[in-house]
Swiss-Prot record:
<keyword id="KW-0699">rRNA-binding</keyword>
<comment type="subunit">
    <text>Part of the 30S ribosomal subunit. Contacts proteins S8 and S17. May interact with IF1 in the 30S initiation complex.</text>
</comment>
<keyword id="KW-0820">tRNA-binding</keyword>
<comment type="function">
    <text>Interacts with and stabilizes bases of the 16S rRNA that are involved in tRNA selection in the A site and with the mRNA backbone. Located at the interface of the 30S and 50S subunits, it traverses the body of the 30S subunit contacting proteins on the other side and probably holding the rRNA structure together. The combined cluster of proteins S8, S12 and S17 appears to hold together the shoulder and platform of the 30S subunit.</text>
</comment>
<keyword id="KW-0689">Ribosomal protein</keyword>
<keyword id="KW-0694">RNA-binding</keyword>
<dbReference type="GO" id="GO:0006412">
    <property type="term" value="P:translation"/>
</dbReference>
<comment type="function">
    <text>With S4 and S5 plays an important role in translational accuracy.</text>
</comment>
<dbReference type="Pfam" id="PF00164">
    <property type="entry name" value="Ribosom_S12_S23"/>
</dbReference>
<dbReference type="InterPro" id="IPR006032">
    <property type="entry name" value="Ribosomal_uS12"/>
</dbReference>
<dbReference type="GO" id="GO:0000049">
    <property type="term" value="F:tRNA binding"/>
</dbReference>
<dbReference type="GO" id="GO:0003735">
    <property type="term" value="F:structural constituent of ribosome"/>
</dbReference>
<comment type="similarity">
    <text>Belongs to the universal ribosomal protein uS12 family.</text>
</comment>
<dbReference type="InterPro" id="IPR012340">
    <property type="entry name" value="NA-bd_OB-fold"/>
</dbReference>
<protein>
    <recommendedName>
        <fullName>Small ribosomal subunit protein uS12</fullName>
    </recommendedName>
</protein>
<dbReference type="GO" id="GO:0019843">
    <property type="term" value="F:rRNA binding"/>
</dbReference>
<dbReference type="InterPro" id="IPR005679">
    <property type="entry name" value="Ribosomal_uS12_bac"/>
</dbReference>
């Protein structure tokens, strides 16, 4: 416990809250280049092959980002736009790739929640 004299000299500091999306450096989204596109399996009760990409962001940090939706056209060297948002059953995946932006195509034949998956309105 500090003495009163130590408190007069230094004072107390507020703890700063840890940011969940540190690699974005305060931006809502960040551009990046895919360095590896692969599938991985989720945590215990679930079973699937989740599509994930390793992305080097313009901030210089390399992160794992989830590719949402059915089917994708991403490969190594694809330019992608990354947003925050974790995938609960994939440990270490704290970012998502935005569909329909830059090199990422939207999901084909998507009828509902189209704006989330970059799908155009069907005529």
């Amino acid at each position: 416990m500090p003495t009163i004299q130590q408190l007069v000299r230094k004072g107390r500091h507020d703890k700063t809250a840890k940011v969940a999306t540190a690699a974005l450096k305060g931006s809502p989204q960040r551009r990046g280049v895919c360095t590896r596109v692969y599938t991985t399996t989720p945590k215990k009760p679930n079973s699937a092959l989740r599509k994930v990409a390793r992305v080097r962001l313009t901030s210089g940090i390399e992160v794992s980002a989830y590719i949402p939706g059915e089917g994708h056209n991403l490969q190594e060297h694809s330019m992608v736009l990354v947003r925050g948002g974790r995938v609960k059953d994939l440990p270490g995946v704290r970012y998502k790739i935005i569909r329909g932006a830059l090199d990422t195509q939207g999901v084909k034949d998507r009828k509902q929640a189209r704006s989330r998956y970059g799908a155009k309105k069907e005529k």
